[in-house]
A protein has these predicted regions:
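Bacterial N-terminal signal peptides
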Residues: 5-15
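Noncatalytic, solvent-exposed loop/strand surfaces
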Residues: 18-448
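N-terminal secretory signal peptides that target proteins for export/translocation
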Residues: 1-2
């Protein structure tokens, strides 16, 4: 008997509902994890690939997924455009591309470009933000609903290296984090950072997703100075004891806020105190991660990992920190999965598993390879997925008492960049029992 139209519609609805979305750069739980199962441990550009599509430009932004849609940002270098794109999840075909900004330059330094921030979606609209401070909301057909240039109202972002914080949707607000220097400066004698006459304080901005208008602006004070004021992390949200919280890392500290108002509740005592020995080059990259009532933050440049309880009040000493020259992460954001933190030291190529309450290191294992990791680990189906500059995906066992490397999978285009803007920095996204892997010039769907 032929299926009826209502039956087919119901089947499609059930299939769509069963697939977990990846609505922002760190996924459905904002911790790099997914509950999806049936994910592959071994694959290549020719093995286990459901589809491959060419991308118009490389960026550190991850594939953001909602239903049948995959959203990414990209620079069009020759056309000097910054675009938002949508691909069909089932086929990989491009549905639309929308120009958000036409810029004089799409790249300001040799490490990244202006499309580094990932998109975010609430299932109704998709939100794009670029490092030149231009943001827009589009509907799912690619039509721009609103567009703003934050330079006009809040000034250009004043970070030495290209701004990379991703927008985050939580409840009824769109959040933009700008942790920046407190004065204007010029980078490489060419690019002006910050805007004269504007307040150069670091801040978090809450925006109405429907209109793009400011709801509130929270100034986020810090004792940091010079480059240590800068952060490339993104806001993280969690609920603890019936209170919705926002976590911000950077400026030599981790702070916890009321999500609804931005009011600061607590902060970890600084890892970089003012005075003799102060390091003014401690820019921060990793975002905070939450698990089992504990928030962790990775201090910069081989410094320890620090932990703060979510119920802390005021300035609080960390409840634990890793040993000096021990577990650390300068760039990748850790993940949380099934009661454990997973911390990737991208420079030394070491993956560690930590117990949240005590910081006990359960295991540390060497991934290997000949180049660094600056993408963040993704954990799902009892596997940890880490991708390096060359597009090599290392798969390790998660939810295990000991380190076990399961496979190394070549997904790059054969080039061997070593930290320049052509290096793979996008973390892996997960949905519908598949991995979505962005490399130098392609997007892969690997799995079912």
């Amino acid at each position: 008997m032929k299926p009826t139209v209502p039956f087919l519609a119901l089947a499609l609805l059930v299939q769509t509902a069963s697939a977990e979305n990846w609505p922002n750069w760190r996924g459905p739980n904002q911790d790099g994890s997914s509950s999806e199962t049936g994910l592959p441990a071994k694959f290549s550009t020719k093995e286990g690939v459901k589809w491959t599509t060419d991308l118009p430009g490389i960026a550190a932004s991850v594939p953001v997924i909602w239903g049948d849609n995959i959203f990414i940002t990209a620079p069009l270098k020759d056309q000097k455009k910054l675009v938002g794109l949508c691909y069909d999840k089932a086929s990989g075909k491009e549905k639309w591309r929308t120009t958000i900004s036409e810029a004089d330059e799409v790249q300001w330094d040799d490490k990244s470009n202006l499309a580094s921030p990932s998109a975010a979606t609430d299932g109704e609209r998709v939100y794009f933000l670029f490092a030149n401070a231009v943001a827009a909301a589009c509907d799912f057909s690619g039509k721009i609903i609103w567009k703003r240039d934050f330079k006009e109202t809040h000034g250009a972002f004043a970070t030495q290296w290209t701004y990379g914080s991703s927008p985050t949707i939580d409840s009824d607000k769109l959040y933009i984090q700008v942790l920046q220097r407190n004065e204007t400066f010029q980078f490489q004698g060419k690019f002006n950072k910050g805007t004269e006459g504007k307040d150069m304080s670091s801040y978090v901005l809450a925006i109405d997703p429907a209109t793009g208008k400011d709801i509130w602006k929270h100034i986020r004070p810090s004792l940091a100075a010079v480059e240590s004021l800068e952060a490339f992390s993104s806001p993280v949200f969690t609920t603890y004891k019936d209170q919705r919280l926002m976590l911000i890392s950077g400026g030599d500290t981790l702070t916890i806020h009321e999500a609804a108002t931005g009011k600061e509740i607590s902060r970890v005592a600084t890892w970089n105190p003012p005075g003799d020995g102060y390091n003014k080059f401690f820019r921060l990259v990793p975002s905070p991660v939450v698990g089992d009532g504990i928030a962790i933050v990775c201090a910069p440049k081989n410094s320890p990992v620090f932990a703060l309880p979510l119920d802390a009040k005021g300035e609080t000493q960390p409840i634990w920190q890793t040993e000096p020259k021990g577990v650390t992460s300068d760039v990748p954001t850790p993940a949380f999965y099934k009661g454990k933190f997973y911390v990737l030291d991208g420079g030394k190529k070491l993956l560690s598993c930590l117990e949240p309450k005590t910081g006990k290191v359960i295991w540390t294992g060497e991934l290997g390879g000949k180049t660094k990791f600056e993408s963040s680990p993704t954990v799902a189906d009892d596997k940890v997925y880490c991708v390096n500059f060359w597009g090599e995906v290392y798969v390790a066992k998660a939810n295990s008492d000991q380190f076990e490397l399961l496979s190394v999978n070549e997904m790059g285009n054969g080039s061997k960049p070593n930290g320049n803007a052509d290096s793979v920095r996008a973390s892996i996204s997960v949905s519908d029992s598949s991995l979505f892997i962005r490399t130098q010039d392609k997007l892969f769907r690997v799995g079912k």
